[in-house]
Amino acid sequence: MKKKYWNIKLEDMLEARVHLGHSTQNWNPKMAPYISAKRKGIHIINLTRTARFLSEACDLVFYAASKGKKFLIVGTNNAADEAVARASKRARCHYVNKKWLGGMLTNWSTTETRLQKFRDLRMEQKKGGLNNLPKKEATMLKRKLARLQKYLGGIQYMTGLPDIVIIIDQHKEYTALQECRTLGIPTISLIDTNCDPNLSDIAIPANDDAMASIRFILNKLVFAICQGYFSQLRKP
């Protein structure tokens, strides 16, 4: 796989606070190779390592997208949810940004059934069918539709398992990560200093609590995905 240049600059990462890890008391010793210093009780992430692994991840998603592969982005913490939705829509990726429902991937047949119910309800609502129902039943179905939209809206067009999953906040999305490992789906994880870098195929050391840091990482990845899709369209 030929390496490409993704314009990952040290000053931009510093401005986005990518380098700020967790408290020195809340860390995983496996992250030691990715930590450059301690400052005021906080571990400082080695941004040279961040740039290296982010670049590798961009290469991977670029070439995967150029072959028409599908992506799922998962990030449900308060700092990530909006950034995940926006980035995913830009790159036409599937996403989960509110809550990971256990078995979403490993029990795909159940997820497919839920998605079909969701699509059917949406279609019924668009046609005005819910307005013809008794008030109590219509209210119940509208609540159900709102719940399905909240938790499945980002994967409503997903017709099969994703080829690559991008995970923000390894701790919070541990169930999603384990499902990917069970199914052999490659993962790219943004990992803070309290994470295990060995659990993902590509682990990008970065601050997973700051919105600016999450946006920086996601912007680079979705840009690479978009470039990959564009390169596919340009092929004769």
Swiss-Prot record:
Q: Which GO terms describe its molecular function?
A: structural constituent of ribosome
By sequence similarity, the record places it as follows: Belongs to the universal ribosomal protein uS2 family.
Among its keywords, does the record have Plastid?
Answer: yes
Question: NCBIfam families from the entry?
Answer: rpsB_bact
SUPFAM superfamilies hit by this protein: Ribosomal protein S2
Which cellular compartments is it found in?
Plastid
Which controlled-vocabulary keywords does the entry list? Plastid, Ribonucleoprotein, Ribosomal protein
Q: Which GO terms describe its cellular component?
A: mitochondrial small ribosomal subunit; plastid
Q: Which organism is it from?
A: Cuscuta obtusiflora (Peruvian dodder)
GO BP, sorted A to Z: translation
* Gene3D superfamilies in alphabetical order: Glucose-6-phosphate isomerase like protein, domain 1, Helix hairpin bin
Q: Which is one Pfam family of this protein?
A: Ribosomal_S2
UniProt-recorded name of the protein: Small ribosomal subunit protein uS2c
The principal location of this protein is: plastid
